[in-house]
C-alpha cells in the first residue's frame, strides 16, 4: 500500500507542464511455482486491464473468471467484423410516443443474430466494443440502417417520424461524425432533423 500511495502522488514536470500519474496494478498470486514467468506476467496484466477505465481503483487481482471473460471477449472481437459484413446485427424499432399516445418516432435498438448463439441483446457485446473502440463501426452501421428506414418511411408518406440512434462518446475519437451523417442524409434524401442522436456514456 505504501508503494501504491507513493507512486499515485508522483508528479512529473516537463517544459512547465504538470502531469499526474494514475497507476494500475495487476496482481497474480502464484499458485504454481513451475509456471513460466511470462504466463504469470500475462495473468497480472490481464487483471490490470480490467480496471483501465476505473479511476477509483488501482489494484486488481487475477482469478479464473478473468481468464474466461478474456476468452469470451476475444471471441466477440474475432467475430465482429464478419458479423458486420454478413449483416448479423439487426435493428429493432421501439416506438416513441407523446403523452396522448401518438407515435412520434422510434428508438433504434441493436441485436446480434448470432449464427450459433441465437439472438443476443446488447449486454452480450456492447461493453466489449466500447472497451476496444470498435463501437464506432457498429454505430456507423446502425446510423445507416436508421437512415435507410427513414428513407423508406419518406417514400411511404411517413416523413413526420424520427428515429433516435445511439452515439458513443468514443466515436468522436475515431470518425468524422459530421461527415458520416451528412453522407447518410444525402444518400437517403432524408431530413437531418429526423435522425436524432443520443449520446451514451
Locations of regions flagged by a protein language model:
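Catalytic strand-loop-helix junctions within cyclic-nucleotide turnover domains
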Residues: 1, 15-18, 22-40, 65-68, ...
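Catalytic core regions of nucleotide second-messenger enzymes
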Residues: 7-23, 52, 118, 154-161, ...
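Catalytic/regulatory signature loops of cyclic-dinucleotide turnover enzymes
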Residues: 15, 41-63, 79-90, 116
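Catalytic core of bacterial c-di-GMP phosphodiesterases, primarily the EAL and HD-GYP domains
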Residues: 29, 98, 102-107, 134-201
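Flexible, glycine/charge-rich interdomain/linker segments that couple
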Residues: 22, 28-31, 50-75, 159-167
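Active-site core of bacterial EAL-family cyclic-dinucleotide phosphodiesterase domains
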Residues: 72-128, 166
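Catalytic-core segments of nucleotide cyclases and related cyclic-nucleotide turnover enzymes
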Residues: 4, 15, 30-56, 123, ...
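Alpha-helical scaffold within the catalytic cores of cyclic-nucleotide enzymes
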Residues: 2-15, 42-45, 142-151
Amino acid at each position: 500500500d505504501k508503494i501504491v500511495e507513493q507512486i499515485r502522488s508522483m508528479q512529473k514536470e516537463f517544459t512547465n507542464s504538470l502531469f499526474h500519474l494514475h497507476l494500475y496494478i495487476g496482481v497474480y498470486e502464484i499458485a504454481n511455482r513451475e509456471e513460466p514467468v511470462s504466463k504469470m506476467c500475462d495473468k497480472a496484466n490481464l487483471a490490470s486491464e480490467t480496471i483501465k477505465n476505473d479511476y477509483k481503483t488501482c489494484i486488481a487481482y487475477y482469478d479464473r473468471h478473468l481468464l474466461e471473460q478474456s476468452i469470451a471477449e476475444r471471441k466477440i472481437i474475432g467475430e465482429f467484423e464478419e458479423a458486420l459484413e454478413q449483416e448479423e446485427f439487426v435493428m429493432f424499432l421501439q416506438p416513441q410516443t407523446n403523452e396522448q399516445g401518438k407515435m412520434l418516432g422510434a428508438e433504434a435498438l441493436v441485436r446480434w443474430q448470432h449464427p450459433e448463439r441465437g439472438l443476443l441483446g446488447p449486454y452480450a457485446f456492447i461493453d466489449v466494443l466500447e472497451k476496444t473502440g470498435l463501437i464506432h463501426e457498429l454505430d456507423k452501421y446502425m446510423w445507416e440502417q436508421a437512415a435507410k428506414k427513414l428513407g423508406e418511411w419518406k417514400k411511404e408518406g411517413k416523413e413526420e417520424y424520427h428515429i433516435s440512434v445511439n452515439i458513443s462518446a468514443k466515436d468522436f475519437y475515431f470518425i468524422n461524425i459530421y461527415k458520416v451523417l451528412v453522407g447518410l442524409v444525402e444518400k437517403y434524401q432524408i431530413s437531418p432533423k429526423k435522425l436524432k442522436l443520443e449520446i451514451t456514456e
